[in-house]
């Protein structure tokens, strides 16, 4: 606030220095209004009068601790403990602020007079007279009321209206205002509000913690807010703890805890230490068998801890428990016992949070972080029988280890108490470093140094002695070992030896038994967390777990181990897991063991679905069928249930619905239109579909039948997993993590809004939770975009799996063709076409298929579209959606079209489940099927976790095998590798002989797209490597599995994981796929030497003669190339003002290494005196201007920060000519053949359709040139400009095709390293006469205003006169949960690339907005062929078109052109947000949007050298756009800001202050540090070498906010 006020005042002060009285009056009014607003804001805070006299430091303490109040310090009362007494009233007001006004409130031990003065008639105070001090306090409060009334009577005033109800209540019924009973026995008030509250200000100490919850419940208290004094040091063994801020102290004697003030002896309060400790450590306070109060700490202010106790109903805990008994009473009893156990366990776990979590302790006890408790060993010189008191001290852990590590290096002779004390005292005192006195890092009380030194010395001596004894291995000498030990101790302690010996033996640090010696090194310290747990355990007994029953049950399992021991890897068998599964499922362990042995030995005659006999699998296979009789849901029953009609299903609530069993003999799977339709899934209980184990664990029949059964079960498992996930999400939306959030959606029917917004719309089905909290599967219908919900629905959950009826439709289709519950196996001939990579399998399918009678099926949608496109390329439509389909489409829509085909062609069939292939062959009713695939590439992968997919079921049974062993893609060296994988001779047609190479990199840190660009397609083995490369800035990265079947010219294969990866081996199909994707070259980047490197090295060593043997001559082949296309309110946390100039310099050097070392002060001089060769087009040079006139150089301030900034240059012939060549000459010529007029009209049509709101289009009859528009233009001009128009008659115009040329003397800083190798050219200004601007300025200003009014401002922003706050508001409604592609179009040579086409587009836009035809022709004439004259440098030249940098339409024209360019190439109808400013643009599209080739379109149509970048964070006009879950924040580029701080053109201190003010205006958002981590990520995306920069952001804020500190950044 202070910073904003200071910046406002400075801006107003600079404005007031002007001579315009109107501006001065407006500035004065604005200053007055700002001051009034600030005062009103302060006045709205609650007011508290602080009457007691306190010091200035104490005033600051109170103000900082309670910023919620407007505190007025009168200093009219002198009293003891003034600060503590005054803070008590602030604490009471703070507690009352937490309570809704007017709610019935109990003030436990409170001050009823204070509430009466505030007029709180809803507060009841419990003020028991526990001792005489309470009686005195009660009488004092009565006296204060009488004193107040007497003052009112003396002044002849009446009681104010807001106090009168409370005084009336006290007069009529004093017991309703205050009672003298403890809170536990208070009878309360008769009339209460809906919710009752309580406050306890320093009164919890006297209420037993065990009775507190019950007392609150008796008064029906909803929430209780409390405050009490406490100190972490109370957990030490010290008897005295000081509270310095309020001048008080605690003293402890056993369980008696006394509280007193330092300068006051009469106020002494005594409490129970154990009771106070319970309030600190306990989390829950039971009130009844049902209710409990949960404690939560709020804040700590001036030695006072604030917390609240919330009332909770434990009956809302989940009560469900599984029970198999038939006795209802026993069932209900077991349920109650289980629930009470769960309730108690939940509360105990809540209480243990503080005791078990060290981070929680550090949060609530911040002073104790990194502090340890060290014992002190007292040296006694008195008689033996004297008992010594134990003492402990809390010191820094770092200090302890610094001392111990140092003195442990001492030799035996040097290890004395004196040396230890000397070292400890030296590191505690001040030291001198390089002539500068530095304060010690550790603030340890000097009174403790001697005792601490003794502890460190004794600890080290014992530890070294123990090490010596271990080394010597107890060798026998003339003296016994015990004598050696005592000799060493005597030498160390000299005359103190007898007492030290007694101390060591009494403390049991050394145990002596005759000549046996035992040395025990004591614990060095105890952490604060351990002491907290110890103190709490001493008063609260922790529960102990009884494990006897589990041990007895585990013992029974050993009888079954003798049967299992004969199996391989039987030592890895987990007995405990096996025991739990057998007990849960009711399986005899001995029987299970025998079945395992029989199955593994192939003696059982059964095929089990699991791959190996694990503990769970065996128990599941032997589980008996369980029929559930619970009402209210549809249940799955055992296989002996016969066929049921719909009526029977409804009556019995039973259906045999999912899965297949080998012993099914009923007709339950017969085809039935009524049962087999998708409607059977509607409103079916989720428990029916969610299967926690296989419905059939044993498959029988031929292999194809078993494969079909396993495939159907896999579909059921997939549907079960989807429903299970939705059921979990619908009950707990907070459980969705960020990675999976975009896959799910949860709709609240009551609120009519999405709690979790899904990425897509129009889901086919979902999971519904009704008013009874039961979940069902529902087929969704829509009314427009809204879901049609039932009356009892509460929530609807959807996911990416529920977009279509995928698994449901497949299950329906497959079950419709079952015969007697068994799959039908077709008699068609199945031929496997096994082809090597790149053999042309798709081309062969197109050549063999007859689309009139055959069917082509492919796994993916894109592959199907590709085949249809290639088949119809001749113009004749032969391939349709009926004969070329995806596998999913064929299964889900089975029966709705042709069902019989002659031949079936299945592309990439080996990537499908073999059971799916068998079903496809049978359902197509074909006579012959061709399955195309690659037996050596990646096969079908089971995507459902925990679903069993035995290995023997993965083999596809076929009748014939055809091989294709000629690759059209792979080079010769890869063909040599393929011959090692395939049977038969593999040949190639490629002319490339060698294509492989590899490079071992030092680590993942070296991967950077700038320093190490990767050629071609980037492929990784794992998703983690893919994510890492994408985060480093690489684009278009995919895994090996994702690119199977695709072809690329060049491939970069990357491995950044040093740990072993299972899929990287010589036998892995992933290796084969990765090495066979390229046609020209592949390079492998790896951090370790692995199997891939071994293969590549072997291929590099193969002779060229041998590789030529694998080549064959063929005609020109055209291989399909598949290439990827480029596709609220902010939280405010004030930034700490820390850091130094060195921080900013370090950050600049890390981001732009080397720029600060460039000495460019005399580059302009060097340019003048050396010979230069320039490529100049036709121009006229006045060589008399080649030597610039001598001018006195202005003195400037010298910046402290070293950057690449240059001093202002002097205009001259050479300097201006270089700038003209750079900015105006040598314009690019990339455009193709363009029909300018027609194309411009089409582009403008797209521009108006994309950006303008049709309802707001401007009518044609609005005058553009009027007195009002001219006055608006004049108001924006400077006085010097108006003076040039004094003699202008507005009758005739100067030549509109003539422009003046000049340069900007200050070079523009670029945030790259080009300054190290280039001489940057200056920016030019090409401008018209002011007389021309006086005519066209108002016209285009009015056109611009009307254009911006018609723009759809909710989606588009044309950045004209916008503030950073307006930018934040524009982007604030971006949904951070919706994946987006952020695009930036970077155009080089933007101004001089604009030609006749750009002018035509711009003129067409102005004409449609209403520009007069005559003015349009004049303006067009002035921008076709133009003359530039530079009178200062003596240069004259002619230019065609181009954008003039000083024209009246320069900014808006550039903005319009970039917007029109993007609207002509990109699908703007899908755009979420877009912003344009000059040649800058930022676009937000939905993730995955397809984009055309931007570079080609920009070149051929717009003559632009353009590149389209996809970013994670937007960068617009030198600002980072950070969108987050609360909105958006715009940060000014910190590197650009630091670069400006190295400016060398600052003239004087006044100029410097103006410079600081301008920087404050643009960089104000840096004062909010809440999103610094996001800013680090955004900067790291643009500048790869940038370190985390929160330290430099704080330093920038520090210097910009302080006027005097900012002056130190520049020297005279």
UniProtKB/Swiss-Prot annotation:
Belongs to the ssRNA positive-strand viruses RNA-directed RNA polymerase family. Residues 52-466 are annotated as: Methyltransferase. In resistant plants, is bound by host protein Tm-1 (e.g. tomato Tm-1 AC A7M6E7), thereby inhibiting replication complex activity. This is Replicase large subunit. It catalyses: RNA(n) + a ribonucleoside 5'-triphosphate = RNA(n+1) + diphosphate; ATP + H2O = ADP + phosphate + H(+). Pfam families: RdRP_2 (PF00978), ToMV_Hel_N (PF20896), Viral_helicase1 (PF01443), Vmethyltransf (PF01660). Residues 831-1086 are annotated as: Helicase. GO terms for molecular function: ATP binding; ATP hydrolysis activity; mRNA methyltransferase activity; RNA binding; RNA helicase activity; RNA-directed RNA polymerase activity. Heterodimer of a large and a small subunit. Both large and small subunits interact, via an ATP bridge, with host protein Tm-1 (e.g. tomato Tm-1 AC A7M6E7 and AC A7M6E8). Residues 1380-1493 form the RdRp catalytic domain. This protein is translated as a fusion protein by episodic readthrough of a termination codon. When readthrough of the terminator codon TGA occurs between the codons for Gln-1117 and Gln-1119, this results in the addition of the RdRp region to the replicase. Residues 965-1117 form the (+)RNA virus helicase C-terminal domain. ATP binds at residues 838-843, 870, 968-969, 1077, 1098-1101. Keywords: ATP-binding, Helicase, Host-virus interaction, Hydrolase, Inhibition of host innate immune response by virus, Nucleotide-binding, Nucleotidyltransferase, RNA suppression of termination, RNA-directed RNA polymerase, Suppressor of RNA silencing, Transferase, Viral immunoevasion, Viral RNA replication. Residues 803-964 form the (+)RNA virus helicase ATP-binding domain. SUPFAM superfamilies: DNA/RNA polymerases, P-loop containing nucleoside triphosphate hydrolases. Residues 72-280 form the Alphavirus-like MT domain.
